[in-house]
Amino acid sequence: MLSPKKTKYRKQHRGRMKGKAQRGNKIAYGGFALQAIQPCWITSRQIEAGRRVLTRFVRRGGKLWIRIFPDKPITMRASGTRMGSGKGSPQYWVAVVKPGRILYEIKGISIKLATRALKIAGYKMPIQTKILKPFEN
């Protein structure tokens, strides 16, 4: 699963997801892409689940690019802990995804196979997604 090797700080504020994605919203590498329609946090496990689906379809013929990286730590406290006494320890990592952000790109496989693969990968995501084809960019 994806996670940063080193970070400046162990813990982060939650923040808020306003507006649409300004960067990473166009196809850059592949021919087909999976684009987010809603804002959300996508965990490293969800990214990995989508990657497994796509690599199964792509095989040796094509190439896959993961365009998001989980760089935000999410902290949790032990259940049954009383209020106070600081913030919990980091449990997992998430990628902050705004609407319009490209999640995955693939290249080197047929249109039919690519749309099928991206559709299944979209089911693994916690948000609504859209499949982009080369001429729709």
From Swiss-Prot:
* InterPro entries reported for this sequence: Ribosomal_uL16, Ribosomal_uL16_bact-type, Ribosomal_uL16_CS, Ribosomal_uL16_dom, Ribosomal_uL16_sf
Q: Which CDD domains match?
A: Ribosomal_L16_L10e (cd01433)
Q: What is its main location?
A: plastid
Region: Disordered; residue ranges are 1-21
Per UniProt, the keywords (alphabetical) are: Chloroplast, Plastid, Ribonucleoprotein, Ribosomal protein
Compartments (UniProt record) = Plastid, Chloroplast
> Molecular function (GO) terms listed?
rRNA binding; structural constituent of ribosome
Q: Does the keyword DNA-binding apply?
A: no
Specify the superkingdom: Eukaryota
Q: Name one GO biological process term.
A: mitochondrial translation
One short Pfam family name for this protein?
Ribosomal_L16
Q: Name one GO cellular component term.
A: chloroplast
| Bridged cysteine pairs (disulfide) | none
Q: Which PANTHER family match?
A: 50S/60S RIBOSOMAL PROTEIN L16 (PTHR12220), LARGE RIBOSOMAL SUBUNIT PROTEIN UL16M (PTHR12220:SF13)
SUBUNIT field = Part of the 50S ribosomal subunit.
Family membership noted in the UniProt record:
Belongs to the universal ribosomal protein uL16 family.
Protein name in UniProt: Large ribosomal subunit protein uL16c
Recorded source organism is: Oedogonium cardiacum (Filamentous green alga)
